[in-house]
Structures are given as structure tokens and as C-alpha cells.
Amino acid sequence: MIKVVRAKLHGITVTGADLNYHGSITLDPEICAQAGIYPMEFVEIWNRNSGARISTYVIFGEPGSGCCILNGAAARTCQRGDVIIIAASEYTTPDRLYTLKPRILTFTAGNRVDRVLRYDVFKGPDRAFDFRTLDITAGEDAAALEPVPILD
């Protein structure tokens, strides 16, 4: 088994940090649904401003708010206005990489989804596992995307 990215929020802005809350990251559930991130799912967080890297779990905030709030100890690593990357992962076999289609959301000001991308692993002419990033923003209704199944 290998650990791979399953969903990613790339360039989302931290809207708050609550040191006194008991852990987690609070995210807009509409954003999570577009990417395929579930409540209580563990995610990795990488702070582009400071370089800090942490792991915590997701809880849902107000739908449509664009919220991205670090809670508890995580609040020490990310402050309001920091730009972060949030990645969900899963364990899978290399052969399943051909069917796994992770969604990556990029953001504009106010944490509005700018683009919807998809990672694609395919058999190339020179190697068994090749890689490309596809922009599916115009090809699919990003707001109507169903969460990505974690298990087959």
C-alpha cells in the first residue's frame, strides 16, 4: 500500500484561529463537498506563510461562509490571513492510481473556489505511471460534484 493525496484545498486563506477550542480545523462544508473531504477526516495542513506542517481533523462550519479556522494547538501554527494547503490522503495500491481522480480546488479572495483541478495518473508511452494535472473547472459543474468515495 502507498499513501496518496485524495483531495486538496490549495491556497485557501485562514479566516480565524481559536486557541481555546478543543482541536481541529473548521471548514465550510460546501467547499469540503466539492473537494471530497469528510467531517472528522484527518488532513495535513501546510502553511505557505510560515512553512509549518501539521495534522488535524476536519469539522464543519457555516455552509457558504468560506470559513477556514484553526482550533486548539493548531491555532499556534496558522493565523488569520495565512495562505495554506490542506490535503486529505488515503492508502491504496499502485494499480488503483489509474482510477483515483483527486480533486484540487484553488481559491480567490474570500475563499471562493477559483478552479477545480484533477490529478490524473495514466500509462504513458515511456513509463507505466505518468502524471498530469487537468483543469476540469469548465468541464464539470464544480458545485454539483459529489464527494469522492474513500473506499471502493
UniProtKB/Swiss-Prot annotation:
CDD domains registered for this protein in UniProt: Asp_decarbox (cd06919)
Domain of life the protein comes from: Bacteria
Enzyme Commission identifier(s): 4.1.1.11
GO cellular component: cytosol
Entry annotation: catalytic residues: 24 (schiff-base intermediate with substrate), 57 (proton donor)
Cofactor(s), names only, from the UniProt record: pyruvate
Reaction it catalyzes: L-aspartate + H(+) = beta-alanine + CO2
Post-translational modification: Is synthesized initially as an inactive proenzyme, which is activated by self-cleavage at a specific serine bond to produce a beta-subunit with a hydroxyl group at its C-terminus and an alpha-subunit with a pyruvoyl group at its N-terminus.
Pathways involved: Cofactor biosynthesis; (R)-pantothenate biosynthesis; beta-alanine from L-aspartate: step 1/1
A single GO molecular function term of this UniProt record: aspartate 1-decarboxylase activity
Co-factor remark: Binds 1 pyruvoyl group covalently per subunit.
Entry's Gene Ontology BP terms: alanine biosynthetic process; pantothenate biosynthetic process
Residues at which substrate binds: 56, 72-74
Disulfide bonding pattern of the chain: none
Keywords: Autocatalytic cleavage, Cytoplasm, Decarboxylase, Lyase, Pantothenate biosynthesis, Pyruvate, Schiff base, Zymogen
Compartmental location: Cytoplasm
Residue positions, PTM Pyruvic acid (Ser): 24
Its job: Catalyzes the pyruvoyl-dependent decarboxylation of aspartate to produce beta-alanine.
PANTHER family: ASPARTATE 1-DECARBOXYLASE
Family label: Belongs to the PanD family.
Complex and partners: Heterooctamer of four alpha and four beta subunits.
Protein name (database record): Aspartate 1-decarboxylase
